[in-house]
Amino acid sequence: MADLTFKLWQDEAMTVALPVENGVPVLRIEFNGAESKTGVLYFGSKTVGRQLGVQASSTDANPKLIVAESNQAWVASKAVTAGKIVQPENGYMYRASKGGTTGATVPVWSTTVDTGIDDGTTRWVNIGKAFDKSFIKLALSESGLSSGSDIINLPAIINSGAPIPIWFKAINTDAGLRSDATDPIVRIQINKVIEKAV
């Protein structure tokens, strides 16, 4: 979405776009134990005379917003910065407490929160159960969240001007404090679209 004038905005007037980090729009959601957070974003373009539709090569009939997971796999002998998060197959997240280079073999990942794991010249700390994209639901209305999904179909053609409200509900099932704020794992992406002047 970084190259489009159509973006996710924090306000209906489209004055505050979601911040972009590493080419991906980021919305920080932090949980204080098991809870759900509901909110609304706005998808649109404030640039006059723009139109969005799907690319001719797409098999989709409509633009779609899709909840997706970033690749957070551990990689051997890789340089990492402090704050980087990995998500191995054990269902937990680990944040690098210092920069360095990972080791040649996969470390033994502790499932105890706040436990440190040495790995090459870096150190990982267990920060809790991993987020799962299935815990994020999208809908075109707040009432639609009860049957929301991780994919939302938008109109076939979207004109700039009035934004489309995109409601979201994020559910945290873990009792611990959780945040992937330094290195987001879950994101919203768009399918193959094309923007043009009209």
Predicted regions and their residues:
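Sec-dependent, cleavable N-terminal signal peptides
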Residues: 1-3, 197-198
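Beta-sheet-dominated interaction scaffolds and their linkers
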Residues: 4-50, 56-60, 68-71
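Signature of Gram-negative chaperone-usher
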Residues: 9-18, 60-69, 129-179, 196-198
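Short, solvent-exposed loop/turn segments enriched in Ser/Thr/Gly
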Residues: 20-23, 33-40, 162-166, 177-188
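Solvent-exposed, conformationally flexible loop/turn segments
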Residues: 30-35, 77-83, 119, 157-163
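Beta-strand elements of well-folded, non-transmembrane domains
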Residues: 45-47, 170-174, 188-196
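Short, surface-exposed ligand- or partner-binding patches at beta-edge/loop junctions that are enriched
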Residues: 55-61, 183-188
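Tryptophan-rich substrate-binding surfaces of secreted polymer-degrading and adhesive proteins
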Residues: 69-130
